[in-house]
Amino acid sequence: MKNSIKNIFESERGLLLLPFVSLGTPNTQINKQAIIAMDKNGANIIELGIPYSDPVADGPVIQDAYNKAIKNGVNIRKAFKILMNLKGKIKSPIIVFIYYNQLLNYGINKFLEKLIQLEVQGIIVPDLPYDESQILKKKCTINNIALISLIALTSSFSRIKKIARNAEGFLYLISKTGVTGGTGKLMNKLKIIIKTIQKLTSKPVVVGFGINSRRQIKQLIEWNSNGIVIGSPCVQILLQSSKEVCVIKLSGLIKQIKESTSSTSN
């Protein structure tokens, strides 16, 4: 399997859009339609979260989505069925967001074999410390799946250097302390870390956690970020809108964000 994440960053200009939704929200059929709609309306790469009962990195919106999906019977196997139904229907590379215990319980080798079958391009394991990730990284590299590394605002220079120089796919820079979602002004420290990373590696820098406004997007373009992850706003639409209109609303949000990334970069 050829990994297309690198090609996306090389071929697309400006700030790339990486929307996130939880698999199975609000139900499997509408979830599939929502993912296809994100692809058609401007997503460059799509992140998909596998529901988990203890998502320590996620805020209340995504926690709620995971809990509801689990109550509806969505587990790893059902998540894979949704992914199988997406094969050939979207052009954006898919990255799966999964917690480490889920991965261990399912079996790492079996999980990676399934990702290859489903043509998934990358994996994010938010609760796996970088220093403990080498075995998984080696297995991912062999299978041409990018294990995406995360960098926190609190990371030391030596840690940033180590992670940046061994990164695959892109570097996921967490824009704030705490969990996903929420609002607020971006810290100036983020600008410094983006600059630091880009001096250490040619790998793209993608910023996520709490990105939800045009002002933030404008700042990140000025700070030379290569991409943004938009998660909670997308999930919130699937949770709070009626089933008849949630895909339409999500399509509108993706279009609006895509226009912001384009218009502010001109």
Swiss-Prot record:
It comes from the Eukaryota. GO terms for molecular function: tryptophan synthase activity. The active site is at E47 (proton acceptor), D58 (proton acceptor). Keywords: Amino-acid biosynthesis, Aromatic amino acid biosynthesis, Chloroplast, Lyase, Plastid, Tryptophan biosynthesis. It comes from Cyanidium caldarium (Red alga). This is Tryptophan synthase alpha chain. Its EC number is 4.2.1.20. The keyword Cell membrane does not apply. GO terms for cellular component: chloroplast; cytosol. Belongs to the TrpA family. Pfam families: Trp_syntA. It catalyses: (1S,2R)-1-C-(indol-3-yl)glycerol 3-phosphate + L-serine = D-glyceraldehyde 3-phosphate + L-tryptophan + H2O. Pathway: Amino-acid biosynthesis; L-tryptophan biosynthesis; L-tryptophan from chorismate: step 5/5. The gene is trpA. Its main location: plastid. It is found in: Plastid, Chloroplast. The alpha subunit is responsible for the aldol cleavage of indoleglycerol phosphate to indole and glyceraldehyde 3-phosphate. Tetramer of two alpha and two beta chains. PANTHER family: TRYPTOPHAN SYNTHASE ALPHA CHAIN, CHLOROPLASTIC, TRYPTOPHAN SYNTHASE, ALPHA CHAIN. Transmembrane segments: none annotated.
